[in-house]
């Protein structure tokens, strides 16, 4: 932490200040607090001490106390630029972005060569989704301090967010060059490489981050999530990497096991849901309708929101929960204390190793039963009791892929929430175009070389057919050029491909299916969300039967739609089915007219049916826990 170079008789000596800062930087917070308390009795009007006191509270995540002390420092010394900057940081952590920006500007007005304040201002505008403002201030930070690694890193993140991937790459690499021991920069570069479909290179960067910080949970999660994209992955390797996460990121400070107090036969079970996806996100689409139905049953639902989304879908969630805890700014042990205080019976991890997860919370075992739902495979955490499976997602011969015990629902692992607005299904595109349009509405990272080869065979086998690929990644000219070049290697000309970027609304996204005759499911990391959206829009999906959790979702959906003939067992069968179905325009037209209604009545969309099975499962888990606990008591 920086402090003002100026001091007067109201401030401690440089040696005294240095000693306190060394304690703070060594994370010896209790010792630092004692030293500050001692010094502040001697220097009651020290702006520097109150600024440091604020930093101490900020390190303890006591942001309101931090703010009070920064304000005291400013009251004593209204020209204290660093205190204004620190006040802005605390306000930004509380999502008071306009107030934070005001403080950063005050700091800059007092000290116009203040790179940290410019950098923080850029981050605040990034949080406000104003990238042009962010670019301006990150650039200003670098003009003042050309070797400012963090500003380069932030530019890398900004450019990645707006699909300017070449510039993102350059800035991340510059940050690493300037600060080669910062694990966050390698993690961010790995995330970018995953977006670009460079899975092996991404793995290298995630491992570099982990080597620097062996308990770096975010890099571990990104590494494990990245493995989902790799074709022919050794399942034992995935399991071993997940187990490393479970062991190396475990920093338990309190044992809750002996402290549980619960009724053996409660009238309602308290269910805690931990997720960053309560909003316009695939995780939100797969939870909303189920939560609506569970609320009607004998459960109290409590949310632990790891990221409060602000979109047109997020307002549907809060009314479903008895309590809503925003945990994004809370430390793991603080969240765990809240979970224990709430008396949760069953704690549900509802997103897996995707972005902004809080899986380490589950290592504390703050609830009697913990389970994984909506993940892409094992979480690797021994303290999680169960992973929710189904006959097709978790076949018995794959149980050894998981750390958790598998608890199978009878039909499907998750239920999709249809949009609450109508999108008209138009007639079959082929009947208008006189050629077949295949499509995949998925991240470009899911389009691997095996798929490109397979989809090229399909296009080569069906004259005049086209392939539509849509995702915000295709707003990047680099990804467009790379995609065209990859297909050209298989003699597929550019005019056979239709590449479309980001949609402004979800309705606009769904309307793209009116341009697709047959959807092609990617593999091994299959579509799931795009498959459900496609069938709701009347578009059937050819999928490949796989050999691991993420590689089973298409099979599971099509099985529950009674569309068994659309599941291929081999690459050759995948191609032959595409050829067969594309030649039967009458069948495709019939499917288009009936598939939405069929889907809505199937387990894929039938939320009351799903919630019934889910409810039985939860109560059976509780009774099993009570029975086991009673036996232990008798021993």
Segments predicted by a language model, with ranges:
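Alpha-helical solenoid repeat scaffolds of the TPR/TPR-like class and their adjacent stem/linker regions
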Residues: 1-435, 443, 449, 453, ...
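A conserved nucleotide-sugar
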Residues: 298-300, 456-489, 494
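Aromatic "clamp/platform" in nucleotide-sugar-dependent glycosyltransferases that forms part
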Residues: 524
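Short alpha-helix at the nucleotide-sugar/activated-sugar donor binding site of glycosyltransferases
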Residues: 535-536, 559
């Amino acid at each position: 932490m920086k402090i003002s170079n100026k001091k007067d008789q109201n401030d401690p000596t440089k040696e005294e200040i240095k000693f306190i800062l060394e304690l703070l930087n060594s994370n010896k917070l209790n010792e630092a607090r004692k030293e500050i308390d001692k010094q502040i009795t001697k220097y009651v009007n020290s702006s520097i001490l109150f600024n440091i006191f604020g930093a101490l509270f900020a390190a303890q995540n006591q942001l309101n106390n931090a703010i009070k002390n920064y304000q005291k420092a400013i009251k004593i010394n209204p020209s204290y630029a660093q205190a204004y900057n620190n006040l802005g940081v605390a306000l930004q952590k509380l999502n008071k972005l306009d107030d934070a920006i005001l403080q950063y500007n005050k700091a800059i007005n007092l000290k116009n060569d203040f790179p940290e304040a410019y950098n923080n201002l850029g981050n605040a505008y990034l949080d406000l989704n104003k990238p042009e403002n962010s670019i301006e201030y990150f650039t200003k930070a670098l003009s003042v301090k050309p070797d400012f690694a963090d500003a380069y890193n932030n530019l890398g993140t900004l450019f990645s967010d707006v699909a300017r991937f070449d510039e993102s790459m350059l800035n991340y690499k510059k940050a690493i060059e300037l600060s080669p021991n910062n694990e966050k920069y390698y993690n961010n570069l790995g995330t970018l490489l995953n977006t670009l479909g460079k899975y092996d290179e991404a793995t290298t960067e995630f491992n570099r981050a982990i080597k620097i910080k062996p308990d770096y949970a975010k890099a571990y999660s990104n590494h494990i999530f990245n493995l989902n994209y790799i074709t022919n992955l050794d399942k034992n390797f995935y399991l071993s990497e997940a187990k490393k996460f479970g062991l190396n990121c475990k920093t338990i400070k309190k044992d809750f096991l002996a402290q549980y107090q619960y009724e053996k036969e409660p009238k309602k079970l308290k269910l805690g849901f931990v997720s960053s996806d309560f909003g316009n996100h695939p995780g939100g689409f797969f939870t909303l309708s189920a939560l609506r139905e569970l609320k009607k049953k004998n459960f109290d639902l409590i949310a632990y929101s790891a990221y409060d989304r602000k979109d047109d879908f997020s307002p549907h969630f809060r009314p479903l929960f008895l309590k809503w805890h925003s945990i994004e700014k809370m430390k793991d042990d603080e969240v765990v204390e809240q979970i224990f205080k709430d008396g949760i019976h069953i704690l549900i991890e509802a997103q897996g190793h995707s972005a902004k997860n809080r899986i380490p919370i589950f290592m504390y075992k703050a609830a009697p039963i913990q389970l994984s739902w909506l993940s892409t495979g094992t979480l690797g955490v021994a303290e999680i009791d169960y992973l929710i499976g189904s006959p097709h997602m978790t076949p018995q011969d794959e149980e050894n892929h998981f750390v958790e015990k598998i608890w199978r629902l009878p039909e499907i692992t998750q239920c999709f929430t249809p949009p609450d607005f109508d999108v008209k299904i138009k007639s079959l595109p082929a009947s208008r175009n006189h050629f077949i349009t295949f499509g995949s509405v998925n991240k470009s990272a899911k389009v691997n070389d095996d798929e490109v080869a397979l989809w090229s065979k399909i296009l080569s086998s069906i004259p005049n057919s086209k392939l539509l690929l849509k995702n915000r990644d295709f707003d990047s000219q680099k990804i467009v050029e790379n995609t065209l070049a990859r297909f050209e290697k298989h003699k597929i000309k550019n005019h056979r491909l239709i590449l479309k970027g980001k949609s402004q609304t979800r309705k606009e996204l769904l309307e793209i299916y009116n341009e697709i005759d047959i959807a092609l499911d990617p593999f091994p990391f299959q579509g799931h969300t795009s498959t459900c959206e496609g069938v709701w829009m009347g578009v059937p999906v050819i999928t490949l039967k796989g050999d691991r959790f993420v590689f089973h979702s298409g099979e599971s959906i099509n099985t529950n739609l009674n569309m068994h003939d659309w599941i291929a067992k081999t690459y050759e069968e995948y191609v032959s089915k595409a050829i067969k179905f594309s030649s039967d325009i009458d069948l495709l037209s019939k499917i288009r007219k009936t598939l939405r209604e069929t889907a809505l009545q199937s387990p894929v969309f039938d939320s009351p049916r799903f919630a019934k099975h889910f409810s039985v499962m939860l109560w059976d888990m509780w009774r099993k826990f009570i029975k086991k606990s009673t036996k232990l008591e008798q021993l």
